[in-house]
């Protein structure tokens, strides 16, 4: 069976291969409102504008910063490690990974802060087809994801240094946001100038 056969009526395409694998003809055959996750970098399996040209109802995500819904491991890795290190997790288990993903998903549904709106001026920041996941420079990630990871580590029994007061822990993480602000601002400005 080929991809062309398998894609007929599919709700989802998850690409982790190479450029040009998914064609416009294939996209036409997908189910209503297909979710197309074209993750090959730097050139995805299909460019978003090509998919949208034949399927305006398609919901797309790529690994590229110059398109909506950039899927980037920077959304999870620093924060899952922060939580794991802070509670002395003996391993990073499935519960912690799920907690990380859920915290990121929940954050996408919250209203963007003024800081995020300023960093991504002119971009859609309300949950929907063009904004499924938070932006990489959303400072709320450091306040939400590690707390969820720590909680999951404690509940699953892998935290060797449980954190009693999660709200105090959350507040301590906020200090990283302020400390990182001066460091991150030049990168945010550069990203605005040349988003590729």
Which stretches of residues belong to each language-model region?
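Short, conserved loop/helix-junction motifs that constitute active-site signature segments
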Residues: 27-33, 52-55
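Glycine-rich, charged/polar anion/phosphate-binding loops
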Residues: 1, 20-23, 46-47, 62-63, ...
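A general structural motif
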Residues: 17-19, 64-68, 179-180
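Short, well-ordered alpha-helix to beta-strand connector turns
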Residues: 10, 33-34, 57-58
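Adenosine-phosphate binding glycine-rich loop
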Residues: 38-146, 150-157, 161
């Amino acid at each position: 069976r080929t991809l062309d056969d398998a894609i007929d009526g599919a709700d989802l395409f998850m690409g982790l291969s190479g450029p040009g694998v998914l064609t416009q003809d294939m996209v036409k055959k997908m189910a209503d409102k297909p979710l197309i996750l074209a993750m090959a970098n730097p050139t995805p399996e299909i460019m978003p504008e090509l998919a949208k040209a034949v399927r305006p109802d398609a919901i797309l995500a790529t690994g590229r910063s110059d398109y909506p819904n950039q899927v980037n491991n920077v959304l999870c890795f620093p924060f899952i490690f922060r939580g794991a290190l802070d509670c002395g997790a003996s391993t990073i288990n499935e519960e912690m990974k799920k907690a990380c993903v859920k915290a990121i998903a929940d954050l996408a549904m919250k209203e963007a802060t003024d800081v995020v709106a300023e960093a991504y001026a002119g971009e859609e920041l309300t949950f929907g087809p063009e904004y499924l996941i938070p932006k990489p420079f959303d400072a709320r990630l450091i306040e939400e994801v590690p707390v969820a990871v720590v909680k999951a580590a404690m509940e699953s029994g892998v935290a060797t240094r449980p954190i009693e007061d999660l709200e105090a822990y959350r507040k301590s993480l906020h200090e990283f946001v302020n400390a990182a602000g001066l460091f991150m601002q030049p990168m945010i400005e550069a990203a605005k100038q040349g988003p590729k």
